[in-house]
Amino acid sequence: MAGAFDFDLEKNPPVVQSTADNSSDGAVPGETFTYGDSTYAKIQRLAAELNIEQRGIERVPAAEQTDTSVFNIGSMWLAANMVVSSFAIGVLGKSVYSLGFVDAILTVLFFNLLGIMTVCFFSCFGPFGLRQMVFSRLWFGWYVTKGFAVLNILACLGWSAANAIVGAQMLHAVNSDVPGFAAILIISICTLLVTFAGYKVVHLYEYWSWIPTFIVFMIILGTFAHSGDFQNIPMGVGTSEMGSVLSFGSAVYGFATGWTSYAADYTVYQPANRSKRKIFLSTWLGLIVPLLFVEMLGVAVMTATDIKGSKYDVGYATSGNGGLIAAVLQPLGGFGDFCLVILALSIVANNCPNFYSVALTVQVLSRYAQRVPRFIWTLFGTGVSIAIAIPGYSHFETVLENFMNFIAYWLAIYSAIAIMDHFVFKRGFSGYVVENFDKREKLPVGIAATIAFGFGVAGMITGMSQPWYVGPIARHAAGGDVGFELGFAFAAFSYLCLRPFEIKFFGR
């Protein structure tokens, strides 16, 4: 394999005699961040001395797109999903939706295949040199993108909190004297140390971190298979089964598609001439392998709780996912505890994209926010995530289920509008005038996107199924959640109808 990290990203000298870039493509060379005597420049010079990535949402020049390894793309998502959070999604099949083994496995398979497609698709836009939310301006316009940025910030923070709770459960299962808030702090601070440094360190960490986690999951698989405690819970029948499959599928889809809104953030240093097919395939492999393996493992292990009073049942009731896995590893003694610690720390790989991208997304909100260096926003986002995770620790299942559905809803609408615009109105990658990304007068007005979003929300409401509300179409689907499917369909159809009028009246 070619050297994956033989490139040098943004390690700029502390003082560079240069002027701002005046090229027509809007790209900003890295050395310009340290030019001048402003507070911003001084902070950036300090960052350069510490080898911290200085670039925020500024477009990456072609000369700095030196990440030539395709494996860096796949390993990013391989590590981010080869984690205990994926295991927790599989557990929901029985714990929340009361599915049997085979139907839960099939749901995991098909909804993951559907959910990852948009992540693979949007990863292909990174070589344009723009972060995902910045590139979104070319679909939604200057102001509408800010609304999606707010949703993306909520998604990043929510993901970070939910994942930290899973890791905290693992640490609590190892040592019950470790309170939930302390475990959340440990995991969040470890993640901050990686993401604070920036793109190169994030990719370097993700490149290797999946290996020990994969080994631990193989140990869990082997130990559980040897125990003979697997229970082949039969499939359900009738309309209630359909409702459970659709609702669990929505949660699985939400987890798989959750990276959609910042997929391009992790391919911006790929060369501009990188094959879109290679990016798509590398992303697909990096996602589908860990998602299917770990979620299906979670489905299988959770079947053992069907025996009431068993160590699995007691462990899950006491310490959630951590207690369940601890029950599997119990025969291994102290080595089993070591494996639990490895799994707890796997959350760092899971949360790196969230901590890194939340900072970039905040910068999209205003010029003032962009003037605050990325790494400072990363620090701020970490604090907010901790504040969300600690009170949510004791209500994890409810938090996770509701959050997965929220992710599925809004990302389905976002994807529908962007995909329709790409294939119908831009007619492929050649139809973009990327240089207009920061020229609001040349971007779409956003009226069509706004109305389409409203229609998407209407579709979502009619199809959603939550404890506090069940939409009329969901009721006809046996209470199954079809919110993301209807949100996508309503948004796509309405955008196709409205966008031609927007182009006709505004010319953009």
From Swiss-Prot:
Induction field: Highly induced during germination and drops to a low constant level throughout vegetative development. Repressed by ammonium. Down-regulated by endocytosis in responde to ammonia or the presence of cytosine.
Membrane-protein topology: Multi-pass membrane protein
GO MF: transmembrane transporter activity
InterPro entries reported for this sequence: Pur-cyt_permease, Pur-cyt_permease_Fcy2/21/22
Keyword Chaperone set for record: no
Ranges facing Extracellular side: 94-104, 169-177, 222-243, 300-323, 396-404, 464-477
Domain of life: Eukaryota
One GO cellular component term noted in the UniProt record for this chain: plasma membrane
Segments passing through the bilayer: 73-93, 105-125, 148-168, 178-198, 201-221, 244-264, 279-299, 324-344, 375-395, 405-425, 443-463, 478-498
Locations listed in the record: Cell membrane
GO biological process: purine nucleobase transport
UniProt similarity note: Belongs to the purine-cytosine permease (2.A.39) family.
Stated name of the protein: Purine-cytosine permease fcyB
Species this chain originates from: Emericella nidulans (strain FGSC A4 / ATCC 38163 / CBS 112.46 / NRRL 194 / M139)
Lineage per the UniProt record: Eukaryota, Fungi, Dikarya, Ascomycota, Pezizomycotina
